[in-house]
Amino acid sequence: MGQQLFATNSLGGYLTNNQLSQQVRYLAQTMQRFRQFCDPEPAAGTNRGNKVLFNKISNISTAGGTLVETDTIPKRNYTITQGSLTMTEYGNSIPFTQKVKTLADIQVPETIRTVLMNDMKVVLDSAAATQFKTNDYIATITNTATTTFGSAGAALATAGANMSDKNVRDIVDRMKTLLIPKREDDNYSCVASTNSIRGLYDFFEAKAQLTTLGPLYRGEVGQYYGCRFVEETNFLSNTDGSDGLYGEAVFFGADAVREGIAIPEEIRVGIPADFGRDQGIAWYALLGFQQVWDYSTDGQTRIIVVDSL
């Protein structure tokens, strides 16, 4: 047996160098799907203040009708309610030293940019999702044959199942009776957690049919009963209900949530301090999201949230 050994540094181990792989691996990211459904607010922008006001007009106070020849035409009115969208600063940063940048075997700024981009996408999509989910009209999947609805901002029952085709029909039909307008493709949309739609895949139309409808949404998994379904894993819970096994979902039509942008999200490189030794990279945005219709004040909604006590 030889006397020079790899296992002992002084006898051979010092003759080798470990190598660092140049392939950097990152943690898997959530699927962020809500922001693509926000409508841009053209009144927002730079030098226009941090808030956009928007008016909502009611129907006429009393409907018109037939007239007697000698009567005057009745005089009615409508009411105006006003909503607002507030833009807020968002951001995060990672500082680093010139020394680590200079001596590292991989590109420190590039890894920082990737980590910040991932954070930026999660944060902004969650901000958009909050506006979709903060809603007065709630549907609870009591079981696969029964859907319980509440309109005061809280679920009225505990979920006992994930959505079935029957529950979807209940929700879509309720959206129609609530006069929720369909989106520009003449369909409703649903962003759903993984558990909430696991029972629907047998009912989705063939994907080949979907391609004839135009571009698919990011994360779109199927269509059923006039509603297009998108799966997300960033914001909605998969642990609702009595057994903690059931998922949340959000159904919506047109004009649900608006997005106002003064400064779109961007990566910024900080000005070095301490004679170049103190450096940093950040992401920053000045923008905001706002649900348009509030059932408690407007008497209408554009969103139904699937949730549970």
What function would you assign to each model-found segment?
Residues 56, 192-194, 231:
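Flexible glycine-/small-residue-rich
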